[in-house]
Amino acid sequence: MGSFPSTLTNVPSYWPKAEFSLFVLGQILSISCYFFVAYHIIFEKSARKALHNHVIIILLFYNFLGVTFDLSLTLDRDRVGYVSLFSPTLCRFWQLVDNGIWYGGISLMMWASFERHILVFHSNFVRTTRQLVLVHYIPLIFFSLYAPLLYFYLIFLYPCDEDFDSTSLLCGGMCFYATIPNWFLVYDSFVDYTIPILLIVVFSISLLLRFIRQKQRLQQAVTWRQCRKMTIQLTLVSTTYLIFDLPYVIIFLVQSCGYPNFASNIIQPYVASLTYVPAIVLPYATLLALPRLKQKLCRLFFWKRHQRQIVPLTTYT
């Protein structure tokens, strides 16, 4: 993920402090929204059992780790110039969340974009228990754990000489980069990040177009409302990734095609730090797709007071 540089000459003097303040404010507000959304998805039986919410629950958990753990350490390091709670164990877990959990969230979003086609237009594929296991649960588990387990091995188990730096973001680079074959670095850049982001674009846009095209074919009102909710939810959530991750992918692809200096003056101070934004925005995108949102917000901010009859004390003589 990105960083908050303050020494680059092409950055206005006010920008690092402004960016820092915006991220702190966004983090505080986002955490509150995470709790609100998680409560209404996890503790409402109908929402918790809905297949399309399973991937959303894991996405919320992964991105919550990014907002509370990864972003907090990044902001603290940027504020004081070093990692306050520096220790090798902390550094390893920081690297795991920043890479394994982050890539895991992107893989999950890619699967969610594809699975939503099945849930909206081919719901007969997930009617039996066997179909649920093969089509829903196995892919969900795979895309949830693939990147976190891969980076757990690379960070905690891969044999290399660790040299943590308390003044650097993520305590310095991960040591496996120095010895791992170059093909893996190419694989990691494309398979774990670039291709999933591009597939999110394809699957999300095609879902929206299919929904608009087949809108008239959906005869039952119940089916129509359910399909609309699932499409809106996926569109809102995927948009948070596309707006803030797609620019980074486009710049990476152009640089990989023989233009290494393309946008190099903006990618580090501006574009790289945008990769933190989806984790901040995700709960709001999920919130907008919650059923009966207006009623939930009204209960939160304007709950009714129960009328109580007050009987005055009367003294009898």
Predicted regions mapped to residue ranges:
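Class A GPCR helix-loop hinge within the 7TM core
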Residues: 102-138, 290
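Intracellular effector-coupling site of seven-transmembrane GPCRs
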Residues: 54-61, 209-248
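Extracellular TM2-ECL1-early TM3 structural module of rhodopsin-like
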Residues: 12-24, 52, 58-111
